[in-house]
């Protein structure tokens, strides 16, 4: 069986441990991850989905929870929104937090 998991921000060290282009460790996180869902909650939801035979789950809160629905309903709008966020410096803004 296969379970597709679409997670939002999960409170982990993944961002801190990420590598920069030069191979150095990023060493910082951002507010979205620092305030994300507890990993134990994510694991519980995944296990429950496996146990009950789900095929796909979204584990997200707030705006992140609406992204899969928007992608299904109007993918072009979603891509345009993400493109505008990136052009507006989204990555730099969350890194500065």
Language-model-detected regions and their locations in the chain:
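Non-catalytic terminal and boundary segments that flank Rossmann-like NAD(P)-dependent oxidoreductase
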Residues: 78-97
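Conserved catalytic loop of SAM-dependent methyltransferase domains
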Residues: 60-71
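Short, solvent-exposed helix-helix connector turns and helix-capping sites enriched
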Residues: 73-75
């Amino acid at each position: 069986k296969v379970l597709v998991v679409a997670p939002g921000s999960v409170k982990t060290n993944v961002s801190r441990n990420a590598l920069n282009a030069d191979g150095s460790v990023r060493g910082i996180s951002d507010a979205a991850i620092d305030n994300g869902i507890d990993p134990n909650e994510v694991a519980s939801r995944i296990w429950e989905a496996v146990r009950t035979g789900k095929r796909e789950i979204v584990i997200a809160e707030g705006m992140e929870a609406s992204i899969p629905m928007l992608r299904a309903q109007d993918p072009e709008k979603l891509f345009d929104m993400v493109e505008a966020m990136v052009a507006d410096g989204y990555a730099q803004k969350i890194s500065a937090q």
